[in-house]
Amino acid sequence: MKLSFSLCIFFFNLLLLLQAVISADIVQGTCKKVAQRSPNVNYDFCVKSLGADPKSHTADLQGLGVISANLAIQHGSKIQTFIGRILKSKVDPALKKYLNDCVGLYADAKSSVQEAIADFKSKDYASANVKMSAALDDSVTCEDGFKEKKGIVSPVTKENKDYVQLTAISLAITKLLGA
């Protein structure tokens, strides 16, 4: 009886270990393909971002697309909050204009990504692709706005680059799914 119980515990632990290995493989395998296909995605960033969500450990490729899109929404909201804090301080009027533009662009991006998530879930990957492209473009437009006036430096460059990577991950996944 003692041996049977020990064997059950052993096999249970083995199954847990195998599940962890399999889930790591889908995240790593997907990130490898995504990083190869998209110049906007760093492999390590992809693995760290997707791997941070506990659902990624049991997700399929479609699920990873939804996870990456949700991560983009979360990061976009953080950017809007960060910009809001900057706007509450005394800032140059030109900088303020570009920051306000970014707030609007990230609101548009959030809407696009929410629609893309619905498209992922309904397996309309072509539509998800279009909407993730729009969200990525909104972030690039935000960053490019600061370059319009000499002497203005974007205070959100790193945040924008991370957002571009998150949306590029989702975008690449739509292509892997056949968009």
From Swiss-Prot:
Q: Give the CDD domains listed for this entry.
A: PMEI-Pla_a_1_like
Q: Which domain of life is it from?
A: Eukaryota
Could you identify this protein by its name? Putative invertase inhibitor
Assembly, per entry:
Monomer.
Q: Keywords in alphabetical order, please.
A: Allergen, Cell wall, Disulfide bond, Endoplasmic reticulum, Secreted, Signal
Disulphide-bonded residues:
31-46, 102-142
Annotated compartments: Secreted; Secreted, Cell wall; Endoplasmic reticulum
Q: Which Gene3D superfamilies match?
A: Invertase/pectin methylesterase inhibitor family protein
PTM info = Not glycosylated.
Source organism (scientific name)? Platanus acerifolia (London plane tree)
Cite a GO CC annotation. Answer: extracellular region
Q: Which InterPro entries does this UniProt record tie to the protein?
A: Invertase/methylesterase_inhib (IPR035513), Pectinesterase_inhib_dom (IPR006501), Pla_a_1-like (IPR034088)
How might one describe the protein's use in biotech or industry? The developed two-site sandwich ELISA assay to quantify this protein in P.acerifolia pollen extracts could be useful for the quality control of allergen preparations intended for clinical use. Could be used together with allergen Pla a 2 for a reliable diagnosis of London plane tree (P.acerifolia) pollen allergy by skin prick test (SPT) in most patients of the cohort of 47 tested with a sensitivity of over 90% and a specificity of 100%.
